[in-house]
């Protein structure tokens, strides 16, 4: 079977399953999610063996340590994935929720209720945990899902997807509710992007290249998830220790994720104290700093930041640093270079915090907290399908409700117009 026919056959199966998924009971969905969790734990060794192949291939291809970290599945991460499934099972089912209801003067009763989107296509890169997170949220929100992971994780994804799909079907979900495109070629993605008759929405998760390619070439509607050029602005009134802790966490806890800090802005009135203090704390972590002239004069070993650096998502132990003269300059810089993902101000000035919240255009805007909290589980949504940086149909961490649409139901007594 050629690639086009294979993808269309998979999409057709998903479309058939989506019709049935829309009316699957909450109990059945929860049973399926718990069965999927059990199956992951029971098959831990098989998953780790498959992942070892991907890790070996990744090292041979020269993947960075941060990307290899995203690819890794070990016993602890598999347990975390299983717990994520159970957490989603414990969340309230959004399907059938009455959003609003009212009565018209002609006595028509009109209600708006939450319904699934239908078939969701997820295109993602070297993070096999996305296979589980995406499947969990799609199942709970009554959608069928077509997963297409990156070639780097093909062995891990194939093993995990087969395990959870079989468990879900045995627990009562329709066949085709969870699907993985096992062909890692780009041709498969190109076919997916054109399947308007089968796929209701595409959600790309990955780097700028992947996301831009899907947005540019897809005819299926796309929810654009975030490339994260996230900034931390350390205001003149900031507490030095708090600011340093936030920067270190935002940059180094997991540098290869989209909510990690990539650019640091420091008010000139605090720069001569803060930047050397921060640099000393960063030394054991081997973080590379690229900076403006003033940053270079204050931080030993800092190299020159180019125009490209201000817009770069490093996904590594690197960041760009600029000393700014004012809050206005910080806001202008963020406006110019932000990808509208997550932006942070560290300040003890209430007026400045409120200006920052009001004027920064991003999915998540923080006062005195790390950008690393832009995450579905941290927001209390359970797992997330991605972090949307657009304004239609959803924005920010996308949990269950963001994977639904609505329809109107109308009760009449024979009314005609």
From Swiss-Prot:
Protein name per its UniProtKB record: Gamma-glutamyl phosphate reductase
Family, as annotated: Belongs to the gamma-glutamyl phosphate reductase family.
Function in brief: Catalyzes the NADPH-dependent reduction of L-glutamate 5-phosphate into L-glutamate 5-semialdehyde and phosphate. The product spontaneously undergoes cyclization to form 1-pyrroline-5-carboxylate.
Taxon lineage: Bacteria, Bacillati, Bacillota, Clostridia, Eubacteriales
CDD domains: ALDH_F18-19_ProA-GPR
Pathway membership, UniProt: Amino-acid biosynthesis; L-proline biosynthesis; L-glutamate 5-semialdehyde from L-glutamate: step 2/2
Location in or out of the cell: Cytoplasm
EC number(s) stated in the UniProt entry for this protein: 1.2.1.41
GO CC annotations, alphabetized: cytoplasm
One record GO biological process: L-proline biosynthetic process
Organism: Clostridium novyi (strain NT)
């Amino acid at each position: 079977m050629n690639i086009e026919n294979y993808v269309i056959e998979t999409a057709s199966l998903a479309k058939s399953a989506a019709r049935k998924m829309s009316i699957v009971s909450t109990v059945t969905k929860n049973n399926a999610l718990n069965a999927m969790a059990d199956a992951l734990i029971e098959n831990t060794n098989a998953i780790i063996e498959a992942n070892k192949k991907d890790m070996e291939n990744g090292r041979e291809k020269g993947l960075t340590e941060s990307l290899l970290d995203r690819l890794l599945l070990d016993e602890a991460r598999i347990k975390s994935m299983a717990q994520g499934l159970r957490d989603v099972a414990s969340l309230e089912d959004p399907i059938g929720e009455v959003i609003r209801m009212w009565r018209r003067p002609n006595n028509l009763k009109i209600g708006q209720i939450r319904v699934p989107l239908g078939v969701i296509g997820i295109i993602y890169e070297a993070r096999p945990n996305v296979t589980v997170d995406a499947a969990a949220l799609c199942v709970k929100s009554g959608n069928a899902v077509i997963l297409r992971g990156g070639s780097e994780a093909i062995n891990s994804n194939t093993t995990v997807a087969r395990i959870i799909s079989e468990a879900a079907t045995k627990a009562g979900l329709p066949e085709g509710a969870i699907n993985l495109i096992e062909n890692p070629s780009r041709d498969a993605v190109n076919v997916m992007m054109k399947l308007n008759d089968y796929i209701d929405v595409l959600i790309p998760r990955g780097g700028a290249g992947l996301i831009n390619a899907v947005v540019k070439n897809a005819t299926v509607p796309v929810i654009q998830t975030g490339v994260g050029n996230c900034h931390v602005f350390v205001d003149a009134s900031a507490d030095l220790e708090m600011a340093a802790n936030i920067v270190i966490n935002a940059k180094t806890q997991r540098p290869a994720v989209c909510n990690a800090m990539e650019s640091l802005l420091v008010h000139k009135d605090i720069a001569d104290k803060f930047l050397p203090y921060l640099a000393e704390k960063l030394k054991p972590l081997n973080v590379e700093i690229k900076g403006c002239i003033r940053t270079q004069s204050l931080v030993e070993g800092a190299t020159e930041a180019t125009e490209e650096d201000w817009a770069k998502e490093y996904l590594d132990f690197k960041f760009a640093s600029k000393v700014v003269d004012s809050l206005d300059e910080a806001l202008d810089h963020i406006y110019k270079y932000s990808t509208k993902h997550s932006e942070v101000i560290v300040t003890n000035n209430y007026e400045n915090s409120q200006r920052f919240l009001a004027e920064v255009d991003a999915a998540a805007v923080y006062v005195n907290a790390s950008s690393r909290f832009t995450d579905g589980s941290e927001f209390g949504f359970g797992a997330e399908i991605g972090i949307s940086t657009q304004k239609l149909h959803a924005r920010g961490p996308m949990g269950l409700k963001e994977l639904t649409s609505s329809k109107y139901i109308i009760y009449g007594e024979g009314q005609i117009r």
